[in-house]
């Protein structure tokens, strides 16, 4: 009897699935294939701003370069404490492209929860959305010996901040540009070195019956899910998806 959930032999109904056996490889192959096409939109001050695949790739390349300049190594964990914003996606893709593990943290979590999730995931770099989330990170930073840097997306109200352990996303991208100028092939070497069996993301449970547990998802598992979804649900290049969590 065939396995009901074995989708490996089914061919996709659409051409949306690009080549690649890791999420990072699929992303960079999609950039090459769809460069000038619009990929994401975000409303800023009431106006929708569009991001093409090429623009996304440029930002991801710079953030990834910045991470590598800070000594971020393959299979290290970077956590993201933020609402759903473009920067969340950029940071996530940069971490994965570096061969790292991405861990999302709810922006509604208290400082104590942020501490637990960062400690349990062995987070070395923490991305935070703004001053509100930064306050939580700073409150527990001394209890996180593995945490090396905190990166802030939105620096509004923080421009006078002078803390060697905290930098803006803009500064991280600047470091990335400098790093990439000296090590042009470093990022793609990381992407090519990533394997399907490598850990890609951690998704923590709600912790209703105890402490939250980090579900471990590999690149291979995520790619299999993407291909299965695109096999069973017909989509076109004109379709759009909304992120609301």
Predicted segments, located by residue:
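AMP-dependent adenylate-forming
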Residues: 8, 26-51, 157-158
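Conserved pre-ATP/AMP-binding loop-to-beta segment of ANL
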Residues: 35-38, 171-204, 211, 234-240
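Conserved AMP-binding/adenylate-forming core of the ANL superfamily
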Residues: 39-93, 110-115, 168-174, 219
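Conserved AMP-binding A3 loop
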Residues: 50-54, 192, 200-224
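Conserved structural elements of the adenylate-forming
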Residues: 57-62, 215-236
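Structured binding elements
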Residues: 99
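Conserved ATP-dependent adenylate/AMP-binding module captured primarily in the ANL superfamily
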Residues: 109-142, 225-242
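ANL superfamily adenylate-forming
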Residues: 132-196
């Amino acid at each position: 009897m065939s396995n009901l959930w074995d989708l490996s032999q089914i061919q996709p109904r659409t051409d949306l699935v690009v080549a690649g056996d890791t999420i990072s490889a699929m992303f960079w192959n999609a950039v090459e294939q769809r460069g000038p096409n619009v990929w994401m939109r975000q409303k800023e001050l009431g106006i929708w701003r569009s991001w093409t695949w090429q623009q996304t790739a440029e930002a991801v390349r710079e953030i990834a370069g910045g991470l590598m300049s800070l000594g971020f190594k393959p299979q290290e964990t970077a956590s993201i404490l933020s609402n759903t914003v473009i920067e969340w996606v950029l940071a996530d893709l940069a971490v994965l492209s570096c061969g790292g593990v991405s861990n999302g943290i709810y922006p509604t979590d208290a400082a104590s929860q942020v501490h637990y999730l960062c400690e349990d995931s062995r987070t070395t770099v923490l991305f935070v959305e703004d001053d509100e989330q930064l306050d939580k990170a700073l409150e527990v930073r001394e209890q996180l010996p593995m945490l090396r840097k905190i990166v802030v997306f939105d620096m509004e109200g923080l421009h006078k901040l002078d803390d060697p352990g905290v930098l803006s996303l803009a500064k991280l991208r600047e470091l990335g540009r400098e790093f990439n100028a000296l090590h042009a092939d470093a990022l793609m070497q990381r992407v090519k070195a990533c394997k399907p069996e490598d850990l890609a993301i951690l998704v923590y449970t709600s912790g209703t019956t105890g402490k939250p547990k980090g579900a471990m998802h590999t690149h291979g598992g995520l790619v299999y899910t993407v291909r299965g979804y695109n096999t069973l649900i017909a989509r076109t290049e004109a379709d759009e998806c909304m992120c609301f969590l």
